[in-house]
Regions:
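TPR-repeat structural position
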Residues: 97, 145, 192-193
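N-terminal J-domain/J-like co-chaperone modules of DnaJ/Hsp40 proteins
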Residues: 1-38, 49, 53-56, 63-72, ...
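Alpha-helical junction/boundary sensor with strong preference for TPR arrays
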Residues: 33, 111-112, 159, 166
């Protein structure tokens, strides 16, 4: 699986970061797990991916080779299937919840559907819910309330389908309810814009036709 992520974003540093800053960021990421609900297995894989990135970026020769690849147009990182969920988690943590949600949703669908009751199913379901919520927050910050609602609704549907995490589902439902007034205003403003555009178009036609 290739994810739209680079090693600097993965570990949470700028491309100009020193080795000391990278190691400090690495330790902070290890000490702070994103959510207590993830399984030990996926958290271990996450730690391994962070460690591999820290090792690469603190080795001068390996870092130079990687930076050359990026300069030559290399984009994204490849993750083995057994580390896919940890990779998706790191994508979400890097500030890309929309991309993380879409890819996680896909991983829950055939032919990739995880085995019922497996740790993979549990981790993907939790990640789908958390990333849908963060994606909705991003859309709301941009005043795209309908898009925010869509992310929340999809997150809720996934939790309903999986029959898991009723408390988290209730949180998403509360977030969706809180969005309702903003969605109404959003739809009304769109309708008003459509009316204005229609009026402007009709007025232009009248002028052209001598009306």
């Amino acid at each position: 699986l290739e994810l739209p992520l680079d090693h600097f974003r993965l570990i949470g540093v700028s491309p100009s970061a020193t080795s000391e800053e990278i190691l400090r960021a690495f330790q902070l990421r290890l000490d702070k797990t994103p959510n207590d609900g993830f399984t030990f297995e996926v958290l271990t894989q996450r730690a391994e991916l962070l460690r591999l990135t820290a090792d690469l970026l603190t080795n001068a020769e390996n870092r130079k080779e990687y930076e050359d690849l990026v300069l030559n147009g290399a984009s994204g990182l490849e993750f083995a299937s057994n580390r896919e969920v940890a990779g998706l988690m790191l994508l979400w943590e890097s500030g890309s919840p929309k991309e993380a949600f879409k890819l996680t949703r896909k991983a829950l669908q055939p032919p990739q559907t995880p085995a019922l009751g497996s740790s993979r199913e549990a981790d993907l379901t939790l990640l789908a819910a958390l990333s849908s919520r963060d994606a909705a927050i991003k859309e709301q910050d941009q005043r795209c309330y309908s898009n925010a609602a869509d992310f929340l609704q999809e997150g809720i549907q996934i939790l309903q389908r999986m029959g898991k995490m009723s408390e988290l589902r209730k949180n998403l439902e509360d977030d969706l309810s809180a969005l309702l007034p903003y969605r109404i205003l959003d739809l009304l403003s769109r309708d008003l814009i459509d009316v204005c555009l229609l009026y402007t178009s009709d007025a232009a036609d009248d002028v052209l036709c001598g009306g």
